[in-house]
């Protein structure tokens, strides 16, 4: 596995972890729950 693949996997993991809560907050705010 090259360094580029490791960096890409870390970026993908970070994106998933960051996008999960962001989507939940976005949907909640759209529904007016916040």
Swiss-Prot record:
Annotated function: A core subunit of photosystem II (PSII), probably helps stabilize the reaction center.
Localization terms from the record: Plastid, Chloroplast thylakoid membrane
Keywords (A to Z) from UniProt: Chloroplast, Membrane, Photosynthesis, Photosystem II, Plastid, Thylakoid, Transmembrane, Transmembrane helix
Subunit structure: PSII is composed of 1 copy each of membrane proteins PsbA, PsbB, PsbC, PsbD, PsbE, PsbF, PsbH, PsbI, PsbJ, PsbK, PsbL, PsbM, PsbT, PsbX, PsbY, PsbZ, Psb30/Ycf12, peripheral proteins of the oxygen-evolving complex and a large number of cofactors. It forms dimeric complexes.
Membrane topology: Single-pass membrane protein
BP term (GO), one: photosynthesis
Stored Pfam families: PSII_Ycf12 (PF05969)
UniProt-recorded name of the protein: Photosystem II reaction center protein Psb30
UniProt source species: Stigeoclonium helveticum
Transmembrane spans: 6-26
GO cellular component, one term: photosystem II
Family per similarity comment: Belongs to the Psb30/Ycf12 family.
Highest rank taxon of the organism: Eukaryota
């Amino acid at each position: 596995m090259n360094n580029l693949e490791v960096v890409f996997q870390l970026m993908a993991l970070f994106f998933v972890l960051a996008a999960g809560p962001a989507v939940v907050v976005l949907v909640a705010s759209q529904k007016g729950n916040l």
